[in-house]
């Protein structure tokens, strides 16, 4: 097998086991020096919920057979995905407008008060210098790093929350996606920032950082954010639909569905980019071939019912990335109508 799981959206045992990503990680690296890897999301079986998660021996837990998923939950999941996706892209459009407006106003202010900006640092107070240093450091980051940093922070906060015993029940309810649970919608989103194992978190963030800059440069920060967040929920929906179809309800968590979207988007946009496996630099292959192999593995996992990873979520994320690489430019161009409407609305309120 060309590559195995480093990025995993795996299936966790809901009661008897802890989320544990104890897997070997053959990681890919883009020849330009940026690392790439495989994604994983973890899954739990749908046993009676308990806030006491016992240590695992490292063996994956199989989802229980013949556990029905309520039809109402599936309908809610589909409706939430549609509404969330529309909201993300509408919000990204408004954010783009506000960022552009702020940039224009800032340039105008600098042109008018350039003498103030030209003062030496010695004439400024200590805190102003600190803020200026932080701003300069932030401005020196690549577009990908600027998108990666806040997403990493959110994942680290969620990871720390798993370590607080008093929050364990809340984390299970809202930060794991389970189609048979009472709360279905928001966990589809929050679970994409949730990792229980340090290895799981490291593998996913490592891969995301590898592809973030290529995606951010191609998409722009607002579109990148909308695609990433929407892809996370869409991959959760694919997991929900698969579990409903196979009557294998269980909890899932991990960022790999959204990351697979970035990976598939970049590999589709730049299919001739050469990838190599970390520690095996002599073995190279094209990005186009790599994504086909990864999707083939996930397709086999879905068809054969493999339980260690959430293959449906992986496959859904990859499909979203390929779709956006193919049709995203045309869809994103349609935001102009909303931009004009928001501009007129904002101007009306200012009168």
UniProtKB/Swiss-Prot annotation:
GO terms for molecular function: endopeptidase activity; serine-type endopeptidase activity. Its main location: mitochondrion. Residues 1-50 form a transit peptide. InterPro entries: Peptidase_S54_rhomboid_dom, Rhomboid-like_sf, Rhomboid_protease_S54. The active site is at 256 (nucleophile), 314. Its EC number is 3.4.21.105. Disruption phenotype: Lethal with most dying before pupation. Mitochondria in the testis and skeletal muscles display morphological defects indicative of defective mitochondrial fusion. The few escapers that survive to adulthood, display neurological defects, male sterility, and do not survive for longer than three days. Also displays photoreceptor degeneration after prolonged light stimulation and abnormal photoreceptor synaptic function which specifically affects both the generation of light responses and the signal transfer across the first visual synapse. Residues 51-73, 168-182, 245-247, 298-311 are mitochondrial matrix. Residues 95-146, 204-223, 269-276, 333-351 are mitochondrial intermembrane. It is a multi-pass membrane protein. GO terms for cellular component: mitochondrial inner membrane; mitochondrion. It is found in: Mitochondrion inner membrane. The chain crosses the membrane at residues 74-94, 147-167, 183-203, 224-244, 248-268, 277-297, 312-332. GO terms for biological process: mitochondrial fusion; protein processing; regulation of mitochondrion organization; regulation of protein targeting to mitochondrion; signal peptide processing. Signal peptide: none annotated. The keyword Mitochondrion applies. Keywords: Hydrolase, Membrane, Mitochondrion, Mitochondrion inner membrane, Transit peptide, Transmembrane, Transmembrane helix. SUPFAM superfamilies: Rhomboid-like. PANTHER family: PRESENILIN-ASSOCIATED RHOMBOID-LIKE PROTEIN, MITOCHONDRIAL, RHOMBOID PROTEASE. Belongs to the peptidase S54 family. Mitochondrial intramembrane protease which plays a critical role in the regulation of mitochondrial function. Essential for mitochondrial development and fusion during spermatogenesis and the development of neurons and muscles. Essential for proteolytic processing of Pink1 and HtrA2 into their mature forms. May also be involved, but not required, for the proteolytic processing of Opa1. Interacts with Pink1 and HtrA2. This is Presenilins-associated rhomboid-like protein, mitochondrial. It comes from Drosophila melanogaster.
